[in-house]
């Protein structure tokens, strides 16, 4: 029996229903996948324009661009504010320091960069460079830091664990350049050189103000991500630990030192001499004085012995009978 025209379903109802279901499913999936792949120390939610995923750094609450590396200043602030019971977040050990002064709670500007003056939420202040490392003596709140001095040269000094033989320098160079290009998205031109003398590896990163274009990853941020990877505290979301291999052979790093060179030399006074350095100087001076004293005493003893021998010989000559 033929149906009446009022009973026939509209031909577009089913496709429209499928589109609605697909949209809802896609939106739910987007919410489930709302994470920041380049920074796990973020809080993400689909509250951006059009319901897009938006991530904000812990501590500062600033929105971050998850298509590139997060600035080191925002990362340090996030590490300082991370709750102790947050198992999914990086909590640095007491010995995981970025410089000799250790970890501190930095002040960041609206672009996520370090402010030139840092006080660690106290009345003690100092000036830092673009990577947040102290470059002056510490002072009080009256201390002035006129500009944020850029770090244009970073030397990463590594020591790898003993291996059966030395790595091929060319293969090692190529692997480390690939790592910085693919994992840290640093333009190859900023990896100036890779040096190798078993077991020491040195990676030189160079980037001055005129070379860095909009969108370029900063060498300070790349070096910091690399440092955290090496120490087993990766900042990337959902990625495994760093697995470095050269021609299939694992490259295991056991020591990392990072040196920073600024465009303007740092300003430290003699107060920067540490107790250890002063102790070394004192030991050297004492050793020199002791050595000189021993030398003088030895010379005097030798001189006195010669005089006694001469006097004895003269006495014997006087006792001999004359012919």
UniProtKB/Swiss-Prot annotation:
Post-translational modification remark: The N-terminus is blocked.
Biological process annotations from GO: negative regulation of branching involved in ureteric bud morphogenesis; negative regulation of cell motility; negative regulation of epithelial cell migration; negative regulation of ruffle assembly; negative regulation of stress fiber assembly; negative regulation of substrate adhesion-dependent cell spreading; positive regulation of stem cell differentiation; regulation of epithelial cell proliferation
Signal peptide: 1-26
Subcellular location: Membrane
Pfam families listed in its UniProt record: EPCAM-Trop-2_C, EpCAM_N, Thyroglobulin_1
Extracellular-side segments: 27-274
Disulfide bonds: 73-108, 119-125, 127-145
Membrane topology designation: Single-pass type I membrane protein
Classification via InterPro entries: EPCAM-Trop-2_C, EPCAM/Trop-2, EpCAM_N, Thyroglobulin_1, Thyroglobulin_1_sf
Residues listed as glycosylation sites in the UniProt record: 33, 120, 168, 208
GO annotations of cellular component type: basal plasma membrane; cytosol; extracellular exosome; extracellular space; lateral plasma membrane; membrane; nucleus
Transmembrane spans: 275-297
Keyword match Zinc: no
PROSITE patterns hit by this protein: THYROGLOBULIN_1_1, THYROGLOBULIN_1_2
Ranges of residues in domain Thyroglobulin type-1: 70-145
Expressing tissues: Placenta, pancreatic carcinoma cell lines.
Keyword terms, alphabetized: Amyloid, Amyloidosis, Corneal dystrophy, Disulfide bond, Glycoprotein, Membrane, Sensory transduction, Signal, Transmembrane, Transmembrane helix, Tumor antigen, Vision
Cytoplasmic side: 298-323
Main location: membrane
Role according to the record: May function as a growth factor receptor.
Disease: Corneal dystrophy, gelatinous drop-like: A form of lattice corneal dystrophy, a class of inherited stromal amyloidoses characterized by pathognomonic branching lattice figures in the cornea. GDLD is an autosomal recessive disorder characterized by severe corneal amyloidosis leading to blindness. Clinical manifestations, which appear in the first decade of life, include blurred vision, photophobia, and foreign-body sensation. By the third decade, raised, yellowish-gray, gelatinous masses severely impair visual acuity.
Family that this chain belongs to: Belongs to the EPCAM family.
Cross-referenced PANTHER family: TUMOR-ASSOCIATED CALCIUM SIGNAL TRANSDUCER, TUMOR-ASSOCIATED CALCIUM SIGNAL TRANSDUCER 2
Name listed for the protein in its UniProt record: Tumor-associated calcium signal transducer 2
Primary gene name: TACSTD2
């Amino acid at each position: 029996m033929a149906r009446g025209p009022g009973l026939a379903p509209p031909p577009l109802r089913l496709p429209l229903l499928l589109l609605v279901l697909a949209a809802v499913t896609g939106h739910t999936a987007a919410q489930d996948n709302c994470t920041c792949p380049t920074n796990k120390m973020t809080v993400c939610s689909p509250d951006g324009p059009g319901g897009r995923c938006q991530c904000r750094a812990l501590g500062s609450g600033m929105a971050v661009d998850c298509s590139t590396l997060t600035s080191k200043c925002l990362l340090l602030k996030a590490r300082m504010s991370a709750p102790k019971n947050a198992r999914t977040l990086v909590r640095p050990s007491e010995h995981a320091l970025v410089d000799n002064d250790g970890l501190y709670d930095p002040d960041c500007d609206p672009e996520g960069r370090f402010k030139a003056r840092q006080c660690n939420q106290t009345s003690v202040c100092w000036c830092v460079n673009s990577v947040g490392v102290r470059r002056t003596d510490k002072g009080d709140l009256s201390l002035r830091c006129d500009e944020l001095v850029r770090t244009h040269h970073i030397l990463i000094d590594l020591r790898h664990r003993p291996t059966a033989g030395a790595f091929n320098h060319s293969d090692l160079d190529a692997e480390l350049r690939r790592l910085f290009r693919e994992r840290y998205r640093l333009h190859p031109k900023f990896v100036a050189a890779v040096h190798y003398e078993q077991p020491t590896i040195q990676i030189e990163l160079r980037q001055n103000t005129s070379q860095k274009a909009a969108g370029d990853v900063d060498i300070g941020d790349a070096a910091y991500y690399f440092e955290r990877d090496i120490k087993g505290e990766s900042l990337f979301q959902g990625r495994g630990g760093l697995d470095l291999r050269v021609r299939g052979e694992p490259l295991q790093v056991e020591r990392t030192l990072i040196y920073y060179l600024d465009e303007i030399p740092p300003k430290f006074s003699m107060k920067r001499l540490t107790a250890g350095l002063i102790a070394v100087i004192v030991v050297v001076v004492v050793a020199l004085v002791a050595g000189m004293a021993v030398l003088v005493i030895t010379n005097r003893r030798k001189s006195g012995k010669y005089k006694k021998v001469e006097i004895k010989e003269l006495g014997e000559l006087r006792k001999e009978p004359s012919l």
